């Protein structure tokens, strides 16, 4: 579900006290496609890959986007990387809580990549993530993106659904 960021060297003068906690994640509002957000670009690039695979385009879905955005923000705020939320939530339970009508969802998560293009490339290079992107049964997509001060700094979520 994503690799580690490039290794870095330790600071020349290590701090003598604990660093302050990471700032809260910034969570841009869930905007519909066409608004020029990173989420919009992930949707566009996902549909490019689906077209190459012979699948129809995914439609933007506000409920799936709310679920994906909340999960990305939670990972960024709480400095973890998992399909299971800190409260035990799953992709399906998050989607249903956000208003998706059934639990049939797929999810891709990524961390550390700084652009939509790099994130899509990571997913396309992973067979399990690629399978979600080119699963022609899916009809709708929600995308979440958040930045935080944690280990990976950039957290991405795709929530796929079928109606």
Descriptions of predicted regions:
Residues 1-66, 70, 146-163:
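N-terminal targeting leaders of exported, membrane, and organelle-targeted proteins
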Residues 66-114, 133-135:
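Short, surface-exposed glycine/acidic/tryptophan-bearing loops
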Residues 111-163:
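Disulfide-stabilized extracellular recognition modules
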Residues 51, 105, 138-141:
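Loop/turn elements at helix/coil->beta-strand transitions in domains of secreted/extracellular proteins
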């Amino acid at each position: 579900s994503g690799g580690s960021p490039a290794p870095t060297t330790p600071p020349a003068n290590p701090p003598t006290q604990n660093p302050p906690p990471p700032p809260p994640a910034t969570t841009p509002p869930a905007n519909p496609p066409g608004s020029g957000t990173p989420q919009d670009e992930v949707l566009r690039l996902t549909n490019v890959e689906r077209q190459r695979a012979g699948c129809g385009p995914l439609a933007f879905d506000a409920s799936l986007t709310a679920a994906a955005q909340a999960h990305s923000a939670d990972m960024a705020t709480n400095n973890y990387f998992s399909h299971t939320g800190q409260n035990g939530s799953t992709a399906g339970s998050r989607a249903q809580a956000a208003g998706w009508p059934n639990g049939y969802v797929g999810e891709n998560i990524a961390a550390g990549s700084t652009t939509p293009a790099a994130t899509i490339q990571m997913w396309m290079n992973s067979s399990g993530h690629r399978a979600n992107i080119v699963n022609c049964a899916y009809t709708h997509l929600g995308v979440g993106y958040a930045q935080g001060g944690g280990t990976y700094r950039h957290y991405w979520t795709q929530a796929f659904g079928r109606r």
